[in-house]
């Protein structure tokens, strides 16, 4: 890793926050080094919605159009009752006079990250290192020193500033003694993807719908190729949550059908991960 430029900005974490920050800095001619604990950019089912203000921001380097092309534009979103149907439908198209993006874009955030990585390759003063975890940080009046570790040893990187975007369990935040007050809701979620078209069974269903129910709420979210379904879980282990028979039963409770549902991807997450 290049450690000979004290004026560089260090970024811990190559999620969308870290990658967008890196792109802005590199575009402004500022040297930047990103370190990411994973061996590759994450490619999972995390957040997949880009709202108008975010699209306006990332449009500065062409990323908004990339997300639009790779995703699905959704001007409508809904609150529904699982038994009674639509309760309220909101139309972002009403914002057309104040934003060039009067809609949500449903596009997996990893697609944005990959696009930004390709852009960062065009800047010789920008670098990304994978399999490198942030351990601790110190600072003085002139610089910041970030201790990082890979599978072999530790190294100290120095820079003018450090951006800590290394997640809910941030080593940067903990190292600086910055409190993270509040609580984590003790809830785990099941998120899955299916090619089944829920709008065929519910013609008035918006592309994004939050279904309320006293027993089990559900989120239905359409992407360009599949529907994502988010369920709460009930004090179960991951093995129980991901049991194929239970998943089939839960999907059948949303829309009963004769054929079994095809599930192409699923994962569980805690509230702190969302």
Walk through the language-model features, giving the residues of each.
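Conserved FAD-binding catalytic core of PHBH/FMO-like flavoproteins
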Residues: 118, 143, 161, 165-266
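A conserved short coil-to-beta-strand element within the FAD-binding core of flavoproteins
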Residues: 130-143
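Active-site-adjacent segment of FAD-dependent monooxygenases/related oxidoreductases
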Residues: 51-115, 119
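Conserved N-terminal glycine-rich FAD pyrophosphate-binding loop of Rossmann-like flavoproteins
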Residues: 40-56
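Core beta-strand elements of the Rossmann-like FAD/NAD(P) dinucleotide-binding domain
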Residues: 153-161
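Beta1/beta-strand and adjacent pyrophosphate-binding region of the FAD-binding site
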Residues: 4-15
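Glycine-rich FAD pyrophosphate-binding loop
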Residues: 26-45
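Conserved small/polar residues in nucleotide/adenosyl-binding loops
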Residues: 267-274
């Amino acid at each position: 890793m290049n450690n000979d430029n004290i004026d560089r900005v260090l970024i811990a974490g190559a999620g969308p926050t870290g990658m967008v920050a890196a792109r802005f800095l590199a575009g402004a001619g500022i040297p930047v080094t990103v370190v990411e604990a994973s061996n590759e950019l994450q490619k999972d089912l995390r957040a997949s919605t880009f709202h108008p203000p975010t699209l306006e921001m990332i449009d500065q380097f062409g990323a908004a159009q990339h997300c639009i092309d790779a995703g699905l534009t959704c001007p409508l979103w809904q609150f529904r009752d699982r038994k009674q149907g639509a309760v309220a439908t909101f139309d972002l198209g009403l914002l057309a006079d104040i934003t060039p993006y009067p809609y949500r874009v449903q596009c997996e955030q990893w697609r944005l990250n990959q696009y930004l990585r390709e852009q960062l390759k065009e800047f010789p003063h920008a670098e990304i290192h994978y399999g490198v975890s942030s351990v601790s940080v110190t600072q003085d009046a002139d610089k910041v020193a970030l201790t990082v570790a890979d599978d072999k040893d530790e190294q100290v990187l120095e820079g003018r500033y450090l951006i800590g975007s290394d997640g809910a369990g941030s080593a940067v935040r903990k190292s600086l003694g910055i409190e993270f007050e509040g609580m984590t809701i003790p809830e785990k979620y099941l998120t899955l993807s299916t090619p089944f078209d829920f709008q065929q069974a519910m013609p008035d269903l918006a592309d994004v719908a939050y279904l309320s129910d006293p027993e089990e709420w559900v989120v239905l979210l359409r992407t360009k190729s599949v529907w994502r379904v988010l369920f709460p879980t009930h004090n179960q282990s991951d093995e129980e949550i991901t049991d194929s028979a239970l998943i089939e039963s839960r999907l059948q409770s949303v829309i009963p059908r004769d054929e079994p549902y095809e599930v192409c991807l699923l994962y569980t997450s805690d509230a702190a991960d969302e």
